Amino acid sequence: MHLSDFDFDLPETLIATRPARPRSSARLLVAEARGPFRDRRVTDLVDELQPGDRLVLNNTKVIPARLFGTRHRDSAQGPVSAKVEITLLEPASEGWTALAKPLRKLAEGEEIVFSDALRATVAERGADRVRLVFNCTGDDFDAALAQAGAMPLPPYIAAKRAADAQDRDDYQTVFAARKGAVAAPTASLHFDEALLAALRARGVEFSFVTLHVGAGTFLPVKVDDVTTHKMHSEWGEISDQAAAEILATRADGRRVIPVGTTALRLIETAAAQPGGFGPWEGDTDIFIYPGFEFRITDGLMTNFHLPKSTLMMLVSALMGAERIREIYAHAIAQEYRFFSYGDSSLLLPDRGA
């Protein structure tokens, strides 16, 4: 299985840099295992889903993890300073691990100033990341980060424009509750309160799980034999309540449809445990590619993914590689918008396939 098997040509003009407004007005490509595609809108989920279907939603909350600061050091010529860009990754036992640009010019013990209220000391510098210890913690840190930080937009958007105040709303789901992600669960960005209410009225049910999406979601696959790729790890949790709801839906023969690849990866991680699906908490590095046996997933709502990405491999595993090529060819021909701020799809494989 080669990396090139998951490649395709995407016109640059189809990469979305802003979301649809309102967010639920984005387009929705509905694709079953065979047969014609349906070109709909996200609001049409009310018609496409059935009473009793259960959507599994990721309630992680994106933190403003991108920081721009100034490092200061003394030199033979006197005090010197330089600009530094930091992307927080995850809390460490003390401080935070982070990506830094330029990494090689940072020295352990140096201070980086981000604002009057927020500064950090470089506690460790590794080969590809640093550990920073900030001058404040807890609520004080959250408040200072909210003031100084920017939303960590994906590289393909950040290359075109800087994050702004609008992204604070746009790059956050309406049901975000648990802080810790440095990337949004983007399929869920399409939901607004009106759509959630309409789906409830239709008889669609919801379960909330948490997977803190990490920056590793944007890392490229660097091996040709994709089966040798080492997946990044992310923390997730399925509560007792969510597990019970999902199990009850399955027991009744109804559909479990995760919204987004993060929710899918989390519930399939739990389903692969020796005792079967149930409450779960921990770090998952599950890698889903063609040949994977889905145990709990009956469908998936997901945006359109990058060529040669692990997420292209995931949707190929769900629908079959040939069917996904047909779906993506249709999406490109019909000028669907791609990636995090783009349009969405509802993928419905044969049940039990």
UniProtKB/Swiss-Prot annotation:
PANTHER family: S-ADENOSYLMETHIONINE:TRNA RIBOSYLTRANSFERASE-ISOMERASE (PTHR30307:SF0). GO terms for molecular function: S-adenosylmethionine:tRNA ribosyltransferase-isomerase activity. Keywords: Cytoplasm, Queuosine biosynthesis, S-adenosyl-L-methionine, Transferase. It is found in: Cytoplasm. This is S-adenosylmethionine:tRNA ribosyltransferase-isomerase. Belongs to the QueA family. GO terms for cellular component: cytoplasm. One of its GO terms (biological process) is queuosine biosynthetic process. Its EC number is 2.4.99.17. Pfam families: Queuosine_synth (PF02547). Monomer. Pathway: tRNA modification; tRNA-queuosine biosynthesis. It catalyses: 7-aminomethyl-7-carbaguanosine(34) in tRNA + S-adenosyl-L-methionine = epoxyqueuosine(34) in tRNA + adenine + L-methionine + 2 H(+). Transfers and isomerizes the ribose moiety from AdoMet to the 7-aminomethyl group of 7-deazaguanine (preQ1-tRNA) to give epoxyqueuosine (oQ-tRNA). It comes from Dinoroseobacter shibae (strain DSM 16493 / NCIMB 14021 / DFL 12).
